[in-house]
From Swiss-Prot:
Localization annotation: Cytoplasm
A GO BP entry: tRNA modification
Residue span(s) of domain MTTase N-terminal: 3-113
InterPro entries linked: Elp3/MiaA/NifB-like_rSAM, Methylthiotransferase, Methylthiotransferase_CS, Methylthiotransferase_N, Methylthiotransferase_N_sf, NA-bd_OB-fold, Ribosomal_uS12_MeSTrfase_RimO, rSAM
Keyword terms, alphabetized: 4Fe-4S, Cytoplasm, Iron, Iron-sulfur, Metal-binding, S-adenosyl-L-methionine, Transferase
Cofactor: [4Fe-4S] cluster
SUPFAM superfamilies: Radical SAM enzymes (SSF102114)
GO molecular function (one): 4 iron, 4 sulfur cluster binding
Function text: Catalyzes the methylthiolation of an aspartic acid residue of ribosomal protein uS12.
Protein's gene: rimO
Protein name per UniProt: Ribosomal protein uS12 methylthiotransferase RimO
Length: 439
């Protein structure tokens, strides 16, 4: 019997972690993963349904798999809208929502029974990872308690459920032992970690720690590898983490989605509504940890956004001088409360504002990177091509930030650290020469 499974993972890093967990279970039960539809006995697709373009990509992928294989199991965020999937592809075998690991595995069992002798001994202790060996995503919770009007994540993934502290720290230790040099801490609301447990106390390696964001960062910092924080909602207690960055326990890097700067728009989004307070906090973080890299994301073209309100966002951007910025044009998501707001912004204006926003940020980024010329940066080697080395500094998260390009020399391996002298820069990337390897 064919025990081969095709697997497609779409969407964000949080979905990638879900895929890793499902794949680990399937591999432990003896299934073989194959890269093509035609060789698979069944195909599993982990979908994204956050915005319209993601929904369309998911549906297109399902249709492609149905056309080339015909035996398809669908899971992930779009699975929460089973009717949408059924209308487009009525013959899919099974549909489940996000983080439904056991349900997906059981569906595979039903339509493709597992081998009699699973090869559990072949599964590494850290599980199967879909990232390069030297970095890994560490998911610390599921769901979100926020009520942002542009978002439907709580509908798809439920309320906040923090994973047990000991489970997270054990996974982190296994990843380090497997050679991982960088942990990317992710969730829907990273800084809310532990709220749902009322900061339950646990015993960990002979000491008492609380199930809360600060304690988790502190314990991860003791591993002695890069720890990078993503999706950090700007709660007041986030300020407490910055000294850990200054002291070198975790990377001086904070991914903190701010979404906008105008108070009326922020209130309509149901987000913290004080850009003045945000600017004061940014100044405080930089005073405590001068090397901190601040990344954020913003939405332009939110319903009702006026030219004056957009100009206020640009003014905030210029004053905040954020290091890394992403921007999204508002996209109405089925089920989001923001869809009911008056005065939707036209697509032409959204596009025009997006480009103006990115032009402002490109200049900020260009000037910030120019200031790094002549400095020495610790870099992590991501890739070695025929003619160059591609690396990242402490300021660069994989896939979403810039890169450091270096001339190829012998004795350097992927996943190793090195010191690089920066000699040039552009809008988003750095260029330099290797000084020496840190192994």
């Amino acid at each position: 019997m064919n025990h081969k499974v095709g697997f497609v993972s779409l969407g964000c890093p949080k979905a990638l972690v879900d895929s890793e967990r499902i794949i680990t279970q399937l591999k432990a039960q003896g299934y073989e993963l194959v890269p093509t539809y035609e060789d698979a006995g069944v195909v599993v697709i982990n979908t994204c349904g956050f915005i319209d373009s993601a929904v369309q990509e998911s549906l297109d992928t399902i249709k492609e798999a149905m056309a080339e294989n015909g035996r398809v199991i669908v899971t992930g965020c779009l699975g929460a809208k089973a009717d949408v999937i059924k209308n487009a592809c009525p013959d899919v075998l099974h549909i489940s929502g996000a983080h439904a690991y056991e349900e997906v595995v059981n569906a595979v069992h039903q339509h493709l029974p597992p081998p009699a002798d699973p090869f559990t001994q072949l599964i590494p202790p850290q599980g199967i990872k879909l990232t390069p060996r030297h970095y890994a995503y560490l998911k610390i919770s599921e769901g979100c308690n926020q009520k942002c009007t542009f978002c439907i994540i709580p509908t798809m993934r439920g309320k906040l459920q923090s994973y047990p502290m000991a489970q997270i720290l054990t996974e982190a230790k296994k990843l380090k032992q497997a050679g991982v040099k960088e942990l990317l801490v992710i969730s829907q609301d990273t800084s809310a970690y532990g709220v749902d447990t009322r900061y339950q106390q646990i015993e960990w390696q002979g000491k008492t720690v609380n199930t809360r964001f600060y304690d988790l960062c502190e314990q991860l910092g003791e591993l002695g590898i890069w720890v990078r924080l993503h999706y950090v909602y700007p709660y007041p207690h986030v300020d407490d983490i910055v000294p850990l960055m200054r002291d070198g326990l975790i990377l001086p890097y904070l991914d903190i989605p701010l979404q906008h700067a105008n108070s009326r728009i922020l209130k309509a989004m149901k987000r913290p509504a004080s850009s003045e307070n945000t600017l004061l906090r940014i100044a405080s973080w930089r005073e405590i940890c001068p090397d901190i890299t601040l990344r954020s994301t913003f939405i332009v073209g939110f319903p009702g956004e006026t030219e004056e309100e957009f100009s206020e966002l640009l003014a905030f951007l210029k004053e905040a001088q954020l290091d890394r910025v992403g921007c999204f044009k508002y996209s109405p998501v089925e089920g989001a409360k923001a869809n009911d707001l008056d005065n939707p912004v036209s697509e032409d204006i959204k596009e025009e504002r997006y480009h103006r926003f990115m032009q402002v940020q490109a200049e900020i980024s260009r000037n910030k990177l120019k200031n790094k010329i002549g400095s020495t940066q610790t870099v992590l080697i991501d890739e070695i091509t025929e003619d160059q080395i591609i690396a990242r500094s402490k300021s660069d998260a994989p896939e979403i930030d810039g890169l450091v390009y270096l001339p190829k020399i012998s004795g350097i391996t992927v996943g190793s650290f090195a010191e690089a002298m920066i000699t040039d820069s552009d809008d988003y990337d750095l260029y330099g020469d290797l000084e020496y390897s840190l192994a």
